[in-house]
């Protein structure tokens, strides 16, 4: 593998920074937007949820866009669009204007979270494909940490406009790098551009047998037309579709973005006070989560996907049980243990779900369906995200912290059994081998059973 091949994957993965920043920056900005615009609880939930609704729209359109104009061009356009929408949100003078800007921002993010994992999966050398997809989660976490830190540093001035507007900076920085990157050989072959495909492979892995790789890809694409959603809900890909839809929904409905979006409120409910506790501590938690991703990053291609994923889910279950006890106690004497519960949840999520969900999104479908498959998975994920963003504060008022984390804990147990039963181990497998797994009814062709 060459530095050029690594650069292609890492540049695309760096788009995760802008996604991560938006996830966490709203946590701090929401506190001050609520003061300036005198928002009710429901309106605060709407400010958070509007970007998720936009993401659903973007996710539904992303597969078609990526197949039509390519993975690279899609990534360049969405990055530029994100910068513009971030500035519009920062300049909002009313709640409707802010909601509209957040909606458009969400569309750009929705396209990004579909196209970027596909771009990385199709660009990266096989030996490090899993690690580079995990690196995408690393960049999301870097963005999340930056969002909390910016919110903390600007909290005293209540400068929510700066918190939102700063999001445009990483997008502008990334654009020149993205413009220089090639598209993927698989997309070029989908469009019949053989010479472009050959050049793309040579730039990524100049020492590899390019002609052999082109032949393998061409064989996989032979007699394949444009991917259609209708094909995904029929055999042999129905099983893969159901798997990624359920997995995507469980990733969010188990509560990760409740902690990211509303961490200041959660910490306050546990008894924490002050800007550092409400915005600085979440940044420290995410820093620990980043460490967990690095461990996963260097382990995924050696240990495999399943052991890491299942271990992370177990940590989340233990964390939910801990938080349920802390909130049920409600004496304010368990602050350290409560912080530990949040910390363990974030570490477990980022070690397992957060690191590997994008691996399955990029690996579960053949080339013609890969963008559509990622769109379907993200749409499912965002549906769970929208439910969390739109109703968490209301749930907290109705059920209390103990009730909310009891619900999250039960859903995480369900997630464990789903992954244990249905998630394939794809370590060391070529993308076309993984396609045969799903075509064979969820069994590897060499299995005797």
Q: Which role does the model predict for each range below?
A:
Residues 1-196, 222-449:
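Alpha-helical transmembrane bundle of multi-pass membrane proteins
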Residues 194, 202-208:
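TPR/TPR-like (Sel1-like) alpha-helical repeat modules
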Residues 207-211, 277:
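Alpha-helix N-cap/helix-initiation sites
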Residues 210-219:
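Short, well-structured alpha-helical segments
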């Amino acid at each position: 593998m060459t530095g050029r091949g690594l650069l292609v994957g890492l540049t695309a993965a760096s788009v995760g920074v802008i996604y991560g920043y938006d996830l966490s920056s709203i946590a701090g900005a929401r506190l001050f937007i609520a003061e300036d615009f005198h928002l009710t609880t429901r309106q605060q939930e709407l400010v958070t949820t509007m970007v998720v609704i936009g993401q659903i729209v973007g996710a539904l359109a992303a597969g078609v866009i990526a197949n039509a104009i390519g993975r690279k061009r899609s990534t360049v356009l969405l990055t530029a669009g994100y910068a513009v929408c971030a500035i519009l949100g920062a300049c909002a003078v009313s709640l409707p204007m802010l909601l509209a800007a957040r909606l458009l921002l969400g569309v750009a993010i929705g396209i990004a979270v579909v196209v970027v994992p596909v771009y990385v999966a199709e660009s990266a050398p096989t030996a490090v494909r899993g690690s580079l997809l995990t690196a995408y989660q690393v960049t999301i976490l870097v963005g999340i940490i930056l969002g909390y830190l910016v919110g903390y540093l600007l909290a005293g001035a209540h400068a929510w406009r700066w918190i939102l507007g700063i999001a445009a900076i990483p997008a502008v920085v990334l654009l020149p790098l993205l413009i220089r990157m090639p598209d993927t050989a698989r997309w070029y072959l989908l469009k019949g551009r053989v010479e472009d495909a050959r050049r793309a492979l040579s730039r990524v892995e100049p020492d590899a047998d390019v002609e052999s790789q082109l032949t393998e890809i061409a064989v996989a694409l032979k007699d394949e037309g444009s991917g259609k959603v209708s094909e995904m809900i029929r055999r042999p890909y129905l099983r893969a579709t159901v798997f990624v839809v359920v997995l995507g929904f469980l990733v969010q409905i188990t509560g990760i973005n409740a902690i990211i979006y509303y961490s200041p409120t959660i910490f306050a409910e546990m008894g924490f006070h002050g800007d550092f506790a409400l915005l600085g501590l979440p940044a420290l938690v995410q820093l620990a989560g980043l460490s967990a991703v690095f461990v996963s990053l260097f382990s995924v291609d050696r240990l495999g996907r399943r052991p890491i994923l299942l271990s992370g889910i177990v940590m989340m279950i233990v964390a939910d049980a801990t938080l349920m006890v802390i909130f049920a106690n409600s004496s304010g004497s368990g602050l350290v243990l409560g912080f530990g519960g949040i910390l363990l949840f974030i570490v477990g999520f980022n070690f397992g779900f957060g690191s590997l969900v994008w691996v399955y999104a990029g690996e579960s479908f053949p080339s013609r369906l890969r963008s559509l498959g990622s769109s379907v998975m993200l749409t499912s994920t965002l549906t769970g995200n929208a439910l969390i963003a739109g109703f968490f504060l209301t749930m907290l008022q109705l059920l209390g912290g103990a009730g909310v984390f009891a619900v999250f804990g039960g859903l995480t147990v369900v997630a464990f059994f789903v992954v244990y039963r249905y998630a394939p181990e794809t370590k060391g497998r070529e993308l076309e081998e993984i396609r045969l797994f799903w075509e064979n009814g969820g069994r590897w062709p060499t299995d005797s059973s």
